[in-house]
């Protein structure tokens, strides 16, 4: 099924590509057909803030990780022009702003990974992944995700 038809079927809408918070490329092509998307935070009707295991629950964190992935996909679409060109989600790294005694970073990261699975299925949508607990993230956001995608060099 066409990725845009799949998104419509699932009720998934991409936001506008996120604004950058510094001097960097939002999405960088390298190695011929690989695109690295810089870290994206969640925006759900405005900014969200807090630390997992303190102000933010695992379930909220999963929603935020999904929102991060929507922003990643919006940045990727802006760079490549069409998500039908995506061949594979290769690798994602999810950073989770965590309280000292919080150890459920992988469960939080599942929110973003689940979206990729829903859109592209297991073979193309299940990436390798790291879920990393950190002390602080920019703007006090609870979750940030960066990703690497393999993209077809020919437009659909």
Segments (PLM) and residue ranges:
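Short, polar/acidic, helix-capping and beta-turn segments at strand->helix junctions
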Residues: 1-156
